[in-house]
């Protein structure tokens, strides 16, 4: 009897404790509005308690340290101090705030978000090429990040959502009449790296593939034959990048990729080609290595557009953190966006908002002149930033040739110094922030110069990829002789291709 009394008393104390906690729970209503129109807008919210623990409303899409809402959310939280950051992509200023919740209190806050710039009104439309989020959440995620194009990866090596789920009538879906999501994108990520397949008309099953076999080319070649497919190299430093470039079957490459994150960098190359830590040290080194490889590709005469992807749903990023703005002018559509991306009419960013023109043309343009003539190019730039940017940079043929302080840029009325070309080459414009935790920047796509009908092909850049391929072949890990021969034949063919490029080189 005594034992039962003790148990009953203990349970009573627990119940009273739970009731006390419930009674102390406070309620706060947050409404997010556009500061100018006062209209409610979807947004992303990062909310922490005093211990740094994330607040996670159970009914809203949540990932890592944030959730999204349609613009109004009711939160039930214990007493204490809270801080928050509210964002809607880079086109709105981040709103920082805090509140103290008293026991049983009811509070409300209206949070105005200030729009810095409406890129779509200027003809630039944002997309993220690397999304791993639940399909049912993507429409709200797009609205909360002000994203216009969202290809969602639903098949990925051993994972294939459509083995159990019924395929939709159309893989392309329209969100609030002006945004596009596609539900059949795929990813082949194995020992050679990752290729992203977009605009797929159907699912392509790659679940039979193992880490080392078959070659990524085994899937790339038949997929490339499908009408309208867009193939993206997910990161420049993947081991098979020279192979994929040699194939002529890729359309873009992830200059801003998932190693660049909102609050940190993944400062390694995973299982890709490692960087020289002396040349590319510290937090920014991995991002600079991605740029270096991309510039070497351009220096071999290949014209491949830069792209951007966040890998939200796998890594910590929100959807759209790394984004590519594609210029469509007044002709924005699903197909136009992808076609213009392929043509390089792009700016990639995870922070600064940049709208560059060179001699009145958007990125991707090819300026031509006859042999013996020269071309003078002048860039004009509209720039909006939240993080501090000390310099604007003009990169020509892989080297920074101009560092323009922001105050000088302002005095010049948005004009940058002229660049004279006496031989073929390329240039782009870059704005790197002083953020010390991550590599935050914006880069235009390249502007190309072709004099005398030939592209600039660097011997050193081409040799860089030949050496890379030789190193890659030494890393093939297959004991089965037939499988090994099957994989190596693609590298041998790619090496022959690069040797031919080397023979055609016209600069050191």
Where are these regions (language model features)?
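Short, surface-exposed beta-strand/beta-hairpin micro-motifs centered on an aromatic residue
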Residues: 63-65, 70-77, 416
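Bacterial N-terminal signal peptides
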Residues: 6-20
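Positively charged n-region of N-terminal signal peptides that target proteins for export
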Residues: 1-4
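A short, Gly/Thr-enriched small/hydrophobic beta-strand-prone motif that recurs across taxa
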Residues: 22-35, 127
């Amino acid at each position: 009897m005594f034992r039962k009394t003790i148990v009953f008393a203990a349970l009573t104390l627990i119940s009273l404790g739970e009731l006390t906690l419930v009674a102390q729970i406070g309620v706060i209503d947050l409404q997010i509005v556009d500061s100018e129109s006062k209209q409610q807008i979807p947004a992303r919210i990062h909310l922490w308690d005093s211990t740094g623990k994330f607040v996670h409303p159970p009914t809203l899409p949540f990932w890592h340290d944030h959730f999204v809402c349609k613009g109004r959310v009711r939160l039930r939280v214990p007493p204490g101090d809270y801080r928050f950051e509210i964002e809607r992509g880079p086109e709105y200023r981040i709103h920082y705030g805090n509140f103290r919740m008293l026991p049983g209190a009811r509070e409300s806050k209206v949070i105005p978000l200030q729009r810095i710039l409406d890129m779509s009104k200027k003809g630039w439309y944002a997309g993220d090429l690397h999304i791993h989020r639940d399909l049912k959440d993507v429409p709200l995620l797009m609205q909360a990040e002000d994203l216009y194009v969202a290809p969602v990866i639903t098949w990925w090596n051993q994972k294939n959502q459509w083995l159990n789920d019924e395929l939709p009538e159309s893989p392309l879906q329209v969100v609030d009449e002006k945004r596009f999501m596609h539900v059949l994108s795929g990813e082949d990520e194995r020992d050679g790296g990752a290729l992203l397949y977009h605009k797929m008309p159907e699912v392509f099953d790659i679940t039979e593939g193992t880490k080392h076999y078959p070659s990524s080319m085994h899937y790339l070649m038949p997929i490339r034959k499908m009408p309208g497919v867009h193939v993206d190299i997910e990161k420049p430093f993947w081991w098979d990048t020279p192979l994929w470039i040699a194939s002529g079957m890729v359309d873009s490459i992830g200059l801003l990729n998932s190693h660049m994150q909102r609050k940190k960098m993944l400062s390694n190359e995973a299982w890709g080609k490692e960087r020289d830590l002396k040349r590319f040290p510290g937090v920014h080194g991995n991002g600079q290595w991605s740029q270096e490889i991309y510039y070497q590709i351009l220096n071999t005469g290949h014209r491949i557009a830069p792209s951007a992807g966040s890998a939200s749903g796998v890594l910590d990023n929100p959807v759209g953190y790394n984004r590519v703005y594609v210029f469509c002018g007044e002709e924005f559509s699903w197909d136009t966006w992808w076609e213009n991306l392929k043509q390089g009419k792009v700016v990639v960013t995870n922070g600064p908002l940049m709208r560059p023109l060179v001699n009145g043309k958007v990125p991707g343009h090819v300026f031509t002149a006859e042999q013996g003539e020269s071309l003078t190019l002048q860039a004009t730039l509209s720039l909006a930033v939240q993080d501090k940017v000390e310099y604007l940079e003009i990169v020509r043929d892989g080297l920074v040739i101009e560092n323009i302080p922001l105050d000088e840029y302002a005095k010049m009325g948005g004009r940058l110094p002229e660049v004279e070309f006496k031989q073929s080459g390329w240039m782009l414009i870059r704005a790197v922030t002083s953020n010390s935790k991550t590599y935050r920047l914006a880069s235009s796509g390249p502007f190309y110069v072709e004099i005398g009908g030939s592209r600039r092909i660097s011997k050193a850049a081409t040799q860089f990829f030949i050496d890379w391929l030789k190193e890659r072949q030494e890393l093939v890990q297959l004991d089965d002789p037939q499988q090994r021969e099957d994989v190596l034949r693609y590298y041998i063919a790619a090496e022959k291709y690069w040797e031919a490029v080397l023979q055609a080189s016209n600069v050191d």
